[in-house]
Curated annotation (Swiss-Prot):
InterPro entries: Asp/Glu/hydantoin_racemase, Asp/Glu_race, Asp/Glu_racemase_AS_1, Asp/Glu_racemase_AS_2, Glu_race
Cited SUPFAM superfamilies: Aspartate/glutamate racemase
Pathway where this protein functions: Cell wall biogenesis; peptidoglycan biosynthesis
Biological role: Provides the (R)-glutamate required for cell wall biosynthesis.
Organism of this sequence: Klebsiella pneumoniae (strain 342)
Record lineage: Bacteria, Pseudomonadati, Pseudomonadota, Gammaproteobacteria, Enterobacterales
Gene Ontology molecular-function annotations: glutamate racemase activity
Domain of life: Bacteria
Alphabetical keyword list: Cell shape, Cell wall biogenesis/degradation, Isomerase, Peptidoglycan synthesis
Protein name, as recorded: Glutamate racemase
Residue numbers binding substrate: D28, S29, Y60, G61, N93, T94, T205, H206
Active site, per annotation: C92, C204
Length: 283
């Protein structure tokens, strides 16, 4: 079935008939959450997936906590009204650090968040120096400091906050090349260190999309760690043990908050990830 672009009031193409499958929402401010979705899909290929991204308010890294909580609850509510959910994954580090309590209070289905993979990084580092690459919001939030104090208090944590990397990842998915000189400029504080981090936590779901380029710029042998595989395992456990029986036989679907020329450019990418249609989600 060809990928098509639809607004919220346009009837969808007929869904491909299939057995009912648990419906799982994966949400991000942008398309970085596709990296988490891909890990979940590899482990759990036979689910009904909804991918929603907030291209109107993107990026979240510089937004206030109050705005993020209200916005994420509003979007998840709108999806739940259309498709009863078995589980939701907030595939955005920034949103996860502030919105999970409100979401878990409002909804009966499990809500999985994404947090920086500091704990495994602290176990893997050989030189005791761990880099945290995240948005500026994630770097500044108390939740991140709590993770470090709890799981990596014997390591030296070098934090680097960047909104530009998010933009570069989005541009890459739109087909634009990633300028390595720009990456070197962003990572310069680490590249100038006499002993740089040997293990780097990708603390934003956009950043695994830049893994190849990051490995070309960082010192040889630097480990890059993200939480995608752990989120997939957690999703599988919750679906088996705690999720409600919310199923659909519809095809996978992607939602954005506004249809634009940029979202139209994403159609081939979404199709490759298994989303044949993209709609505007009415809020």
């Amino acid at each position: 079935m060809a990928t098509n672009l639809q607004d919220g009031n346009t009837p969808c193409l007929a869904a491909t008939p299939s057995d009912p499958r648990p419906t799982v929402l994966v949400f991000d401010s942008g398309v970085g959450g596709l990296s988490v979705y891909n890990e979940i899909r590899q482990l759990l290929p036979n689910l009904h997936y909804i991918y929603a991204f907030d291209n109107v308010a993107f990026p979240y890294g510089e937004k206030s906590e109050e705005f993020i909580v209200e916005r994420v609850v509003e979007i998840v509510t709108a999806v739940q009204q259309r498709y009863p959910l078995a589980l939701a994954v907030i595939a955005c580090n920034t949103a996860s650090t502030v919105s999970l309590p409100a979401l878990r209070e409002k909804f009966a289905f499990p809500v999985v968040g994404v947090v920086p993979a500091i704990k495994p990084a602290a176990r893997l580092t050989a030189n005791g120096i761990v880099g945290l690459l995240a948005t500026r919001g994630t770097v500044k939030r108390p939740y991140t400091r709590e993770l470090i104090d709890r799981f990596a208090n014997e390591c030296r944590i070098e934090m680097l906050g960047s909104a530009e990397l998010v933009e570069l990842a989005e541009a890459k998915l739109h087909g634009e090349p990633v300028p390595l000189e720009e990456l070197r400029r962003i990572l310069r504080p680490w590249l100038r260190m006499q002993e740089p981090p040997d293990t780097v936590v990708l603390g934003c779901t956009h950043f695994p999309l830049l893994q190849e380029e990051l490995q070309r710029v960082l010192p040889e042998g630097t480990r890059l760690i993200d939480s995608g595989a752990a989120i997939a395992r957690r999703t599988a456990w919750l679906l088996e043990h705690e999720a409600p029986d919310a199923k659909s036989s519809d095809e996978n679907k992607a939602f954005c908050m506004a249809l634009t020329a940029e979202t139209e450019q994403l159609l081939p990418v979404l199709h490759r990830y298994g989303f044949p249609t993209l709609e505007k989600l009415p809020l």
